[in-house]
Amino acid sequence: MTTFLKGRAKYPQFRKKGINEKFSLTNDQFKLIGKKIKIPNLGWVKLKENLRFNGKILNATVFKKGGKWFVSLGVEIDHLPKLKAKTHKSVGIDLGITDLATLSDGTKIQAPKPLKQKLKRLKRLNKQLSRKQKGSKNREKAKTKLSRLHYKISCIRKDFLHKLTTGLVRQFDVICIENLNVKGMVKNRKLSRVISDLGFHEFKRQLVYKADMHGKTVKEVGRFYPSSKTCSCCGFVMAKEDLTLATRRWTCPNCKASHDRDVNASLNILNKADKVLTLS
């Protein structure tokens, strides 16, 4: 309301019940002792874990996700986390659909693709929900079941990406990636579900903030650079019609070097990435 009165926002709207259920509290509105939090009009509620950081508690946001309630606490800390040891190693990463990440050292990493695994169950629960009467308790139960499955899919994806990005930041000092047009890729109806399932944007987000935390560097190559079609040995660029997406291995007509398409792309990304995304 304050921002509306100052002319910085539109007239506020009421949040509908059951949609994005959450509320915020300032540090004088709640109390935190060990694994318990005191919330106004609710009293003491048990928490699953203790506060992870020591510092001044600023605020709390209580929200519902996947049929469960969570609290997110904002904490002001005095010191930064311990930096990861320097390894003096660099790597280029080519993101793809068959293999989520191909590293310039030849390593190929496959993603779990949780949406693909749970798709049949997801369709079944969606069908069950559509058949329930609006406003009924059975519809609420069906909605909760569907919400829990969506949350589980999201957790599997994020857990895998957290482990992957943490490993990369621990192993390399300089990480080079490509600037993918994820929004444009999602518009392709044949690829949209697969792209969303892999989590390209989330991978980049995690990689950049973790590299910032530990004094590592993330670089990016422009999205129009032909990393797959350029020979990493001599720089010869193949014509688009001579190198289709179905071609996974190719031989450079100029220097006769044989390439794995994705490994070659990751080597080019390592050599050509120049835009620094991190603060370090």
Regions found by a protein language model. Name each.
Residues 1-280:
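Nucleic-acid substrate recognition interfaces
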